Regions:
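Conserved mixed alpha/beta catalytic, RNA-binding, or beta-rich assembly cores of soluble enzyme
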Residues: 1-75, 95-97, 102-112
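C-terminal binding/interaction regions
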Residues: 67-70, 82-147, 153-154
Length: 154
């Protein structure tokens, strides 16, 4: 069994992202892009690893490029991720291919996919993704009643 097959096998144990280099496994759990963003923030050299992920859309493909991962498997892979993976020389395989990645509620397109829609550069994509996450967090805080101006507080 090769490295990507072993990483794929570990996805069945419940991890959302598994990296494997033939000796070491790195398993991450989390929703959306958070496992990839965590790995990026740690600034470790992961270029010798392959990766298996539950869902790989264009945004995730950009982050895999920044991590310098050379081989990925996605249980679900979006068609929009394929040109990015090819551009950065990342081999890919998948369980299912889809036209688009849906948001976690299944009501529309994933906001991260929308964020990178017109972007083809991984560094630019990372900046846009971080800004989108910041905006989404601020909007969620406002919905919870935080972040109101002093004038609106009685």
């Amino acid at each position: 069994m090769n490295n990507i097959e072993k990483a794929k096998e570990c996805l069945k144990n419940g991890a959302s992202l598994v990296l494997y280099d033939g000796k070491e496994f790195i398993e991450e759990n989390g929703k959306g892009l958070s496992p990839l963003l965590k790995l990026l923030s740690e600034k470790n050299d992961l270029s010798r690893f392959c990766a298996a992920d539950k869902i790989i859309g264009k945004a995730a493909a950009m982050l895999f490029a920044l991590l310098k991962i050379k081989n990925v498997y996605g249980e679900v892979l979006s068609r929009k991720a394929i040109p990015i993976l090819e551009k950065y020389g990342i081999k890919y395989s998948f369980g299912t291919v889809t036209d688009s990645i849906k948001n976690r509620y299944g009501t529309g397109i994933c906001p991260m996919e929308q964020t990178v829609e017109g972007i083809d550069d991984a560094d630019t994509a990372l900046k846009a993704i971080k800004e989108k996450i910041k905006t989404m967090r601020m909007n969620n805080m406002k919905k919870l009643g935080f972040g109101r101006s002093e004038e609106s507080v009685v």
